[in-house]
């Protein structure tokens, strides 16, 4: 383990222990161990767990190493798009959950990534920075360390990670545009989202790329990151995503939801320059 230094950049009323727990998603046991072994300092002095932090304080700590992957290790195919010591970007296949949820404990992307780490002889908890819907394919970002995951979470919340999607929608759209309507949780089915004037603000830009008969191929840029945002917005303007069973209909000859995370732009943890990761739709949206 090595010491890491962070400056508290925002006003806070949290104690040192609460700040460290929230920022690095650590367990109470890990927090207690760190303070017991004097692995937390504030302004170069060993810190008490209940010390109040303030903006400008310099926090130095030794984070515990991962002891497991956080999910079951299961061999499966993954396509790596970018990797360094702190970061992993892969191409998620359609019909796959990013992380175990509910009754699904296996055959997820995270299970396969755990196997990928194990094969390389390293132990990292599998830490997805964001999610893609089960039927959506494309670029997805993982932080290998607690520090990298928190960095990317902060970057995402600050709008400094750009996500671009490619999608095929019903009907012909003649011009580029933007949908700017709030999204909330469906009052009946909590796994669905609906347009809701009291919901969270949501903005989706779209650019026309071309046409396939009476369908339009679009490039989407998310200005916000709400659950099912593109799918809900396109259904709202009368052009649902092809193959979207929840907000549209299944459409032959396409065998899956025609939405793909095609581009991700971000500054990697520990580096200064932004990179752009691209990933083409490899299966033509499963067209038969």
PLM regions: where:
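RNA pseudouridine synthases
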Residues: 1-288
């Amino acid at each position: 383990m090595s010491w890491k230094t962070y400056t508290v950049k925002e006003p806070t009323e949290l104690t040192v222990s609460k700040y460290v727990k929230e920022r690095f998603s650590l367990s109470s046991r890990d927090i207690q161990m760190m303070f017991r072994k004097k692995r937390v300092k504030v302004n170069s002095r060993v810190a008490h767990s209940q010390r109040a932090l303030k903006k400008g304080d310099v926090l130095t700590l030794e984070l515990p190493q991962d002891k497991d992957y956080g999910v079951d290790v299961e061999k499966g195919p993954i396509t790596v798009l970018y990797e360094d010591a702190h970061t992993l970007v892969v191409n998620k296949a359609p019909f796959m959950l990013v992380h175990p949820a509910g009754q699904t404990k296996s055959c997820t992307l995270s299970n396969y990534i755990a196997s990928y780490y194990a094969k390389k002889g390293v132990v990292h908890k599998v830490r997805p920075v964001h999610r893609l819907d089960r039927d959506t394919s494309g670029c997805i970002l993982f932080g290998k360390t607690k520090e990298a995951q928190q960095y990317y979470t902060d970057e995402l919340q600050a709008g400094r990670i750009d996500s671009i999607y490619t999608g095929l929608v019903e009907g012909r759209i003649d011009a580029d545009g933007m949908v700017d309507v709030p999204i909330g949780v469906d009052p009946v089915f909590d796994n669905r989202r609906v347009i809701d004037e009291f919901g969270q603000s949501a903005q989706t830009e779209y650019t026309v790329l071309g046409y396939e008969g009476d369908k339009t191929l679009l490039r989407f840029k998310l200005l916000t990151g709400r659950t099912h945002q593109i799918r809900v917005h396109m259904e709202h303007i009368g052009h649902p995503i092809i193959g979207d069973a929840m907000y549209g209909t299944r459409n032959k000859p396409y065998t899956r939801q025609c939405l793909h995370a095609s581009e991700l732009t971000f500054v990697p943890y520990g580096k200064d320059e932004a990179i752009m990761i691209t990933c083409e739709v490899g299966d033509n949206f499963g067209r038969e």
